[in-house]
């Protein structure tokens, strides 16, 4: 899986052998400041390119969602469903609930900071795929996996929850989804995709 923020990076990911890509549109994603973003008008073309090359497309809607963001969030998720993206990647219960209500598949973002099997059991009602907290070590990931198997923790499709994790990324002293330093120092919220990496 590779992040993309432009058609050039999309083609580079495909040529590099990615089996899936993730991207954001319209600002409600954690990559809103770190890359160019597509618009809802790009969705169909991105999905078509991905299908043509046999790869999956995941749309990130993984920021904190405030009340004033709800209309835009619904518009983005509606557009994702219409364009037939493989799934959205969400971190806010509002996005999870809305996507589930319209039949759009959801994967859970690392921004939720799921770091144990009890938290995973709670969120399993929303998604079949969970991206675990970046702060976990391999032993902790294995323990969560073992509990999924032992306790038969399933998602909406009735299948065992699949877990994913980041192998690299922004190295930060803060816990994912819980940082306020960038907002305090630079008036740019890391929890809204605008981390200044200070």
Residue ranges and their predicted role:
Residues 127:
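A conserved catalytic-loop motif detector
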């Amino acid at each position: 899986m590779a992040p993309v923020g432009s058609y050039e990076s999309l083609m580079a990911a495909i040529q590099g052998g990615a089996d899936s890509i993730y991207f954001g549109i319209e600002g409600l994603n954690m990559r809103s400041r770190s890359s160019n973003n597509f618009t809802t008008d790009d969705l169909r073309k991105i999905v078509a390119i991905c299908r043509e090359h046999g790869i999956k497309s995941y749309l990130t809607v993984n920021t904190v969602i405030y009340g004033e963001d709800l209309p835009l969030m619904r518009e983005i998720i509606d557009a994702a469903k219409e364009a037939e993206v493989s799934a959205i990647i969400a971190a806010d219960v509002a996005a999870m609930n809305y996507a589930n209500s319209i039949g759009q598949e959801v994967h859970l973002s690392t921004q939720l900071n799921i770091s144990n099997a009890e938290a995973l059991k709670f969120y399993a009602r929303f998604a079949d795929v969970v991206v675990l907290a970046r702060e976990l070590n391999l032993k902790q990931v294995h323990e969560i996996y073992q509990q999924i198997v032992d306790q038969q923790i399933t998602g909406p499709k009735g299948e065992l929850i699949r877990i994913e994790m980041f192998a690299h990324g922004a190295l930060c002293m803060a816990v994912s989804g819980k940082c306020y330093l960038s907002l305090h120092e630079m008036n740019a919220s890391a929890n809204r995709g605008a981390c200044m990496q200070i």
